[in-house]
């Protein structure tokens, strides 16, 4: 008995050390990070190092912060536009959806310099979210059944114009123009994308070349109020904004079927909309849609253990 205990002591020590390391790691990052008062965020993206970006849906401004220190400053001042979904690519460029402006913008993520602005479509429109592959950027429109594509040129150079990709197949938009349709989007690879339809709570696998869509079978379940998506391997995180939770879905190898395994919640959630990944944590931004916005309304980013 004593020998068995003696043999187990090194393992116990290792487990204790691992627990202490994880605890210390968690303490290195704040649980919440304040954004400027009145900011009205919607999208979040992580960049190089501990950088993160949060856009203002009210002004189009971009806030740049540090996930470790919680400090930050305005990278792009508001200009009367809008900034919703966003992503940073490996060339440190920030791709930003322009919501009702019908545009997309690409910034230098280091200094905030505008590299290019793309007019994508005319009203009615809501350019909602964006995902990146090595070859292209894909933007969703919550009011038009189509994607907008920025096909990168050689060495990742930005294109002169965007292209429109009509969506066909299983996805069907409601005839009511006020219905909020396709929202968050994530790339499986260069050929396949996944997007969520907010109103129905359905997920769709999209052929990135043809625009053909197939509904992903969730065994009869849905993710209503689905907003931002994050895909890590075959694990898909779906932010359900007004439900104040994040669905964790395990997808099969074909990405045509999946199962909701669990839900992540947090006491600090207040209508989270999008989520990003960095340093072993999810980082969700609170849009606070149910709180009347004022210049003094507070907003923040929440660290979530996956």
Label the predicted regions.
Residues 10-19:
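Bacterial N-terminal signal peptides
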Residues 28-35, 70-77, 113-119, 163-176, ...:
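A short beta-strand motif characteristic of beta-propeller blades
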Residues 36-52, 78-94, 121-138, 170-193, ...:
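Beta-rich, blade/repeat-based domains predominating
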Residues 52-59, 89, 94-101, 138-143, ...:
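Conserved beta-strand positions in repeat-built beta-propeller and related beta-rich domains
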Residues 60-63, 102-104, 145-149, 201-203, ...:
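Structural signal for beta-propeller blades
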Residues 66-70, 108-113, 151-156, 207-211, ...:
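Short loop/turn segments that connect beta-strands within beta-propeller blades
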Residues 102-146, 167-170:
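Asp-box/WD-like beta-propeller blade repeats and closely related beta-sheet repeat scaffolds
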Residues 274-306:
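Blade-level signature of beta-propeller repeat domains, shared across WD40, Kelch, NHL, RCC1
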């Amino acid at each position: 008995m004593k020998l068995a205990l003696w043999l187990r002591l090194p393992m116990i020590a290792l487990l204790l050390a691992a627990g202490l390391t994880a605890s210390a790691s968690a303490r290195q990052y704040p649980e919440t990070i304040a954004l400027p008062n009145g900011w009205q965020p919607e999208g979040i993206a992580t960049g190089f190092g501990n950088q993160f970006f949060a856009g203002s849906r009210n002004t189009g401004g971009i806030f740049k912060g540090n996930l470790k220190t919680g400090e930050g400053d305005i990278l792009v001042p508001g200009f009367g536009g809008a900034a919703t979904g966003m992503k940073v690519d490996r060339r440190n460029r920030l791709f930003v959806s322009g919501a009702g402006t019908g545009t997309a913008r690409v910034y230098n993520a280091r200094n905030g310099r505008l590299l290019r602005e793309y007019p994508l479509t005319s009203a009615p429109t809501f350019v909602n979210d964006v995902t990146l592959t090595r070859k292209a950027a894909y933007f969703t429109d919550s009011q038009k059944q189509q994607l907008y594509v920025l096909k990168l040129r050689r060495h990742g150079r930005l294109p002169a114009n965007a292209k429109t990709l009509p969506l066909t197949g299983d996805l069907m938009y409601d005839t009511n123009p006020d219905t909020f349709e396709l929202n968050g989007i994530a790339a499986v690879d260069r050929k396949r994308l996944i997007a969520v339809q907010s109103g129905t709570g359905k997920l769709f696998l999209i052929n990135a070349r043809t625009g053909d869509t197939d509904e992903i079978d969730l065994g009869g379940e849905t993710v209503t109020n689905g907003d931002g998506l994050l895909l890590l391997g075959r694990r898909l995180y779906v932010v359900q904004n007004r439900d104040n939770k994040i669905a964790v879905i395990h997808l099969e190898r074909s990405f045509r079927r999946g199962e909701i395994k669990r839900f992540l919640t947090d006491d600090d959630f207040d209508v989270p909309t999008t989520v990003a990944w960095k340093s072993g944590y999810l980082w969700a931004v609170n849009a606070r849609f149910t709180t009347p916005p004022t210049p003094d309304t507070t907003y923040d980013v929440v660290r979530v253990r996956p």
